[in-house]
Amino acid sequence: MSQSDILYSQAKQLIPGGVNSPVRAFNGVGGTPLFIKHADGAYLYDVDGKAYIDYVGSWGPMVLGHNHSAIRNAVIKAAEQGLSFGAPTAAEVEMAQLVTELVPSMDMVRMVNSGTEATMSAIRLARGYTHRDKIIKFEGCYHGHADCLLVKAGSGALTIGQPNSPGVPVDFVKHTLTCTYNDLSSVREAFEQYPQEIACIIVEPVAGNMNCVPPQPEFLPGLRALCDEFGALLIIDEVMTGFRVALSGAQSYYDVEPDITCLGKIIGGGMPVGAFGGRYEVMEKLAPIGPVYQAGTLSGNPIAMAAGLACLKEVSQPGVHQRLTELTDNLAAGLTKSAKAANIPLVVNHVGGMFGIFFTDAETVTCYQDVMNCDIERFKHFFHLMLDEGVYLAPSAFEAGFMSIAHTDEDIQRTVNAAARCFAKLK
């Protein structure tokens, strides 16, 4: 047995499923999850001493690569001053200043501890601001595990919320409407059915939790227009895309201005951090200056602020996003070419430092149903073949891949060469 096998066996006796977040259990691909000992740059090293080119990046935060010296040194320096104060710090002010400079749609920002906290709080704020209860989310989009967002989408353009997790009462999600990603007609149908009741739309500008599905050109501007028409707020969930698709986020890349933005992952540089922010008149509804309550014992934690500031300062350097996009483009082109040579039908979606691999005969993948029509079993086989080659992809056909600027041209070529060998075995 490997050390990962031994540790997983022990973990399953102590931790539900042996993991602290379900996707880590490899249920989407089968087998034993890797237990990681350390990481550096573009590489993970498991407890058995094997190295892997990493395209998970801790599920997005590691845009600079693992164990970046600037972040590590900032954390050490901050920790020497104390771990948590429960009081304001200068670092919080500096972080707020930097974030609002980088994301112009955010006049004010509130720090929290996770992406889930950010989206949950943003929705509460939107409801408090508009005095409306219903929200629109999209089939296949994930915004954290808050009760009102754990909704199963059925067939058809519009689904009145039904929870897809035991423990979530139907009453908690009855105000959640689910529409089809990249389908504006389904959104208009929802607004026309409830013209005075919808508080907000919450959307991933690039859907990253049904693998990687970019928006069609008209989709995000269309959502903005519908929100304006019906008096709802537009919440763009940039937990995954923020500072990765572009320096100012996917909202700048696609030229759409939200009322509220949610951030996470990269903003913490690997530490647990989230944030949400928006226009003055919306954010001023938050306690302690407004009636909408939100709080957190560890919000604005000084260690997390130090890590996030160091990360954002590095990400803001000239050429970072150009290089990130170049690496991702080269990987996508190489995978596509290798699959074609092996007569394996493949679609590779990519934008900025995100990508998604789909085994499908379809020409495009633009929504959840397209993703569900892909060959999931072939992906499982491909995942394990690539793992044997020393390439670590997301262990699920429904999760995006992430590039870092620590990846080299040699890493990309090694990955493409490995994929070519794996495609040949898939025939």
Swiss-Prot record:
EC numbers, comma separated: 5.4.3.8
Molecular function GO labels: glutamate-1-semialdehyde 2,1-aminomutase activity; pyridoxal phosphate binding; transaminase activity
Reaction(s) this enzyme catalyzes, per UniProt: (S)-4-amino-5-oxopentanoate = 5-aminolevulinate
Keyword Secreted assigned: no
Localization (cell): Cytoplasm
CDD domains: OAT_like
Subunit record text: Homodimer.
Protein name: Glutamate-1-semialdehyde 2,1-aminomutase
Gene name for this UniProt entry: hemL
